[in-house]
Amino acid sequence: MKQELHHTLLGCGFRYTPAKQMPKGILLDTKSRRKGYYVKEYSTKGGVFVIALVLWNDPHIQLPFAYILQQPEQYKGRLLPHINFGFCLCYVTQMEADWNSNDLKSTYQDVDEQIQLTLDNSVASVESGTSNDVELEGEFSAYWQSEEELYLLAKPSRKAQLKAHLVEAELSSGSIRREYVAACSEQSEELVKWLNQRKFDESSLQEVSITTHCISVKPNRLAGVNWPPSCLREVLSWLKLVDYSAHARTVTLLMAKRTKRHILLFDVEGQDELAVYLELNLDVIGKRYFGRNAARKRNINNEAALLGGKFVSANFKRLGVTRADRDTLLSRNQSRPDVGNLSQKRIALIGCGTIGGYLAELLLRSGAGCGENYFHLYDNDSFKPHNFARHSLTAHNFGLAKSIALANSLKEAVHIAQSIKGIDRQFPIQADVLSKYDIVIDATGRPPVSKRLAAVARTLIADIRPVLIHAFNDGNGRASKVLVDDGRCCYGCMMADPAVYRNNIDLRFEGIDLAKEKHISCGSTYTPYDAAVSHITAALAQEAVLNTLEHTLPWNYSEHMLDGSRSKKPRTLKRFSGCNICDE
């Protein structure tokens, strides 16, 4: 294998260079006697790049790392697409890429061609200098080389009054973990939860907050600029080059008042945010530059020159920005973000057993209870050791009410979970209670509850009637089933169809003695089966709940069979004539 790869790379124009013969001062191992690298010169319109390939232990499934040993002088210190830290060439998205891992020759010939193509595209991007550079699309911030992290708990905008705090925590190893956190003033509760969940000390909030400025940047170019900036002067120079309006706003904000500590949050159009933390030396700037009369004409260039002075910025750090606002946290769980998320719905979950426990966690990650509207969990049972094998709760919750323990678990999961409540009693199936919710989920698996919910819901007018979702395991764990009752078909309609059910039993299970499989004792009934069925039922129920955000429901019944038989396709059931609930 090594000989085949060696000859393939030599055939592509690489030369094998022992580690000890590599240039000094590079970030590769140049001392090992056994190591070596494959080096090649690539010609582009901008000059010659010298690339060294670093091979991994298994070259079949890991593509080589491309290290830039040398690049044209005019590009040094400038932002080139796909080149990070000045030496790392990102020629492929390896984790998403696919290649024939059993054909080394073709794979490494493709690597050679891809390196050439990447370098050509990078040089062309610098020379064109456009603002909508496809080579930098969505990855401009990757070249920022941040020194510390800033987490945003709110969407950045010019109107948002963000305040930031530096928080610290001592790890068990004795080292200190620190980060900057920015939030709006009305997010004080979320901010405290963020600190607690991430094991930071709340006392950090007693310190004076850091003034945070959000500045929109619409650059006229991205590639080719000197990058990354290492001081405030270089930041201002960059802004002046690419967006003079953002440059003027930055200078104006910094000179507006006597504030030592600032965070500049740059919202670069079409890219992720960048941030800078800096401390201004107010004595150097001088009192005469603060609180200027608005009627007096400013000289932005003079003020920028002052701010860029050698002794003005006492501390400067590039911050990596990570958004942790509600929309960002929920974004990957939305196939269609335009329909919104469950934070806008009032939801009741009846039953916090196996299905309800898994479903509650899924709904949280779709936004339930993460806004002004509430997410209520109902169950009057407690969590016991024999529930553990099929439940999401842990041994910490033994003896506690399922609903309250589950609600606490959800609230501890993320800082935006602010409207979740566990209620340690049965759900009161009354019209006035049902009308308080948009969605009521029946995860009890009890037919009497399902029938009563369907009947009482029909005493409400359509405008205030909630959507009922029945999620249950059937056939003693052989099937996962979900029915959505939006007024067109109820639980009784489903059970009354003689083509599917007889005596409330699915015809597919008539030949099975279901009662014999159950373990029944006074006050306790259970059926042993794999928890996978409840996972599937919860997943189907989550899909059903998310479908209520759409203008029309794609289906109102879905199932999955786990006994090897064929599952019916999701479908729309209609009202059944003779249903003793709908026809009364």
UniProtKB/Swiss-Prot annotation:
Active site as annotated = 90 (for e2-like domain), 522 (for e1-like domain)
> What upregulates or represses it?
Part of a CBASS operon consisting of capV-dncV-cap2-cap3.
Q: What is its EC number?
A: 2.3.2.-
Keywords, A to Z, come to: Antiviral defense, Isopeptide bond, Transferase
Map out region (E2-like domain) in residue numbers.
1-137
Query: Residues at site: Adenylated?
Result: 390
Q: What class of enzyme is it?
A: transferase
The entry's family comment says: In the C-terminal section; belongs to the HesA/MoeB/ThiF family.
Provide the domain comment: Has an N-terminal E2-like domain, a linker and a C-terminal adenylation plus E1-like domain, dimerizes via the E1-like domain.
Q: What protein name applies here?
A: ATP-dependent ubiquitin transferase-like protein Cap2
Species annotation: Vibrio cholerae serotype O1 (strain ATCC 39315 / El Tor Inaba N16961)
